[in-house]
Amino acid sequence: QPGWFNGWGYPVSIMYGDQMLYFPALLRLLGVSVQNAYKCYIAAINLGTAAVAYYAFLKISGDKKTALFGSCLYTLAPYRLSCIYVRAALGEYSAMLFLPLIILSFWYALKAKEDEAITTDKLAAPVIGFTGLIQTHVLTCFLTAFMILIFCIIYRKRIFRKNVLFYLSRIVLLTLLLNLWFIIPFLQYMGEDFVVTAKAEMTPAFQRWGANFAELFAVYWNGTLNSAWGELASISQKFPKPVGSAYLLVMAGA
C-alpha cells in the first residue's frame, strides 16, 4: 500500500494477507462503487461458505440432507453473522470459508484404516483450506493450529500411524511450498522490533467479552456476550455470540 501515510506507504499485506480482496478490487476498477463492491464480496463469501460447508459435510456424511443441514447450521452461525453484519471483520469471516475443509482433512485421516494409503485426491481440500487461512486471517490460522494440537492429543492413537502421518506431512509440505512467498516476509517482520510484537494487557477486555461454558449455549443475548456499542445499535443488541442451542440439540442427537 504505497499510498498510505502521505506517500510513505505501509506494508500491511505482509502481516495481513489480502488475496481475497482482488475480487472487490476488480469490481472497483470496473466502476462499481466501494459500497456495492463490498456488498458483492459479502454475497460471494456467503455463497462460497455455504457451498464449501456443503461439500465438506457431504464428503463426511455421504447424505445430501445432512450436508445441507450442516451447511445451513455453519453458514448461519451467530458469530459468523456477527462478524459480517456487526463487526465487519472481513478477514475473520473470510477465513471461515475454509474451516470446513480443515475438518474434512482430519475426517480423511481418522477414517483411514491401518496401513491404508490415503490417496492424493484427498490432498486438495486441506491444502486449499490451510492456504486460505494463511492468506486471509493469520490469527484464525494460529487458533486452528492450537485446536489441531488438542485434537491430535485426544486422537493420538489414530493420528500417529504411518499412513496418517505421511498424509498429514504431505499437507504441511504442500501448504508451506504454496505459501512461502507470504510466510518468509511475515516471519521476517515478526522478528523486527515493531509494536505488533509488544505485549498488551487484555485482562479487562477478556473479562468483559469472555463467555463461560454455560453461556456458550445461551439463546438470548445479555450485557456480556453481545456486540452492543451504543443504545441505538439495535441490531447488535440482538446478536448473541454463543454457538446457540441448535448446536446443543445437534450434539445431543448425535
What would you call each of these model-derived segments?
Residues 65, 116-118, 157-168, 254:
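Membrane-interface helix-loop-helix junctions at transmembrane boundaries of multi-pass membrane enzymes
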Residues 100-124:
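Membrane-interface transmembrane helices that cradle and orient dolichyl/undecaprenyl
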Residues 1-98, 105, 132, 136-139:
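Active-site lumenal/periplasmic loops and adjacent helix-entry segments of GT-C-fold
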Residues 167, 172-254:
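Periplasmic/ER-lumenal interhelical loops and adjacent helix-loop junctions
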Residues 143-176, 186:
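Perimembrane helix-loop-helix junctions
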Residues 122-137, 171-177:
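Membrane-interface alpha helices of multi-pass inner-membrane proteins
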Residues 105-114, 150-160, 254:
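Structural signal for the C-terminal ends of transmembrane alpha-helices
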Residues 44-48, 72, 97, 101, ...:
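Generic alpha-helical transmembrane segments of integral inner-membrane proteins
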